[in-house]
Design a protein with these regions (language model features):
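N-terminal leader/auxiliary helical segments
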Residues: 1-90, 94-273
Length: 273
């Protein structure tokens, strides 16, 4: 499914850019860090095919200023049974914020100029990155690093409002399930998926989350723009994690960069591609 690999790859590069002691502390809870790389997106997979307060919170968080979430996260970590595990998760979450906030304004602009969907643009970015890493975009399960466990859900749930560990666990299982469902390396499965989408009236909203057989030439130049933004998100995330660690241990101010949303913001129309 699109977008997932870009966030995972970004997180790996950020981890390599961090100071060694911080790398080691994250590696001790690597699977939680890897889940954190997907930020609020994991909530989308709770009862994914219908509106629900849990998956709606995923959308709401994308539109809110992130500093509100990260201020709350400080309190959650202070009260956590395993603060090191909670920190590893939130460091991954910071990576998600950095990549989203760097790329989404340009995604919005590309949608306006290029007349392609959000999902299609991000699908093509995932394809580019998978290909660069010598993976077959049609066959690679991009959620293979997600390992649903109740012990992880118990760490994650307090970061969200009125969400239980059981709901987080179900969301994580849903994430893996839907990535497997929409992985379509054969023409037979593709036809079955598209027929099923049409049967339930979801084709228009879902068909472009299935990796297309061939890249869209229109998106190639736009992917280069997003790759540039991706390159900037890696050092940004590393810097924000180090600063957030100081916030946690030394009570320094939260970086002003968190006073942005995960989404496109309000200035995207002024951007030039």
């Amino acid at each position: 499914m699109p977008t997932t690999y870009a966030h995972y790859k970004c997180g790996k590069e950020v981890l390599s850019a961090l100071p060694r002691p911080l790398q080691n502390s994250i590696e001790a809870h690597r699977e939680l860090f890897d889940i954190g790389l997907h930020g609020p997106d994991i909530l989308f997979y709770y009862n994914a095919l219908k509106k629900d307060p849990v998956n709606e919170q995923g959308h709401t968080l994308h539109e809110q200023f992130a500093d509100e979430f990260f201020h709350h996260a400080v309190e959650v970590i202070e009260k956590a049974k395993d603060p090191a595990a909670a920190r590893a998760y939130i460091y991954g979450f910071i990576c998600h914020f950095a990549l989203d906030s760097e790329c989404h304004p340009y995604v919005e602009k590309i949608m306006q100029v290029g007349r392609v969907s959000h999902n299609e643009i991000e699908m093509e970015l995932d394809r580019m990155m998978l290909t660069e890493d010598y993976h077959d975009p049609l066959r690679y399960l991009t959620a293979k690093h997600i390992h649903p466990k109740m012990e992880y859900a118990e760490v994650i749930a307090p970061f969200f409002k009125d969400v239980t560990a059981e709901q987080i666990y179900k969301a994580l299982k849903g994430m893996v399930f839907y990535h497997k469902l929409f992985l379509a390396p054969t023409s037979g499965k593709r036809k079955a998926l598209f027929l099923g989408m049409k049967a339930v009236g979801k084709y228009d909203s879902l068909h472009d989350i299935v990796m297309s057989v061939k890249p869209d030439p229109l998106c190639q130049k736009y992917c280069k723009v997003l790759k540039r933004q991706y390159s900037g998100a890696v050092p940004l995330a590393a810097s924000l994690i180090v600063q957030y660690q100081k916030k946690l241990f030394q009570d320094t101010p939260l970086p002003e960069r968190f006073h942005e949303t995960f989404g496109a913001g309000e200035e995207w129309e002024k951007l030039r591609l």
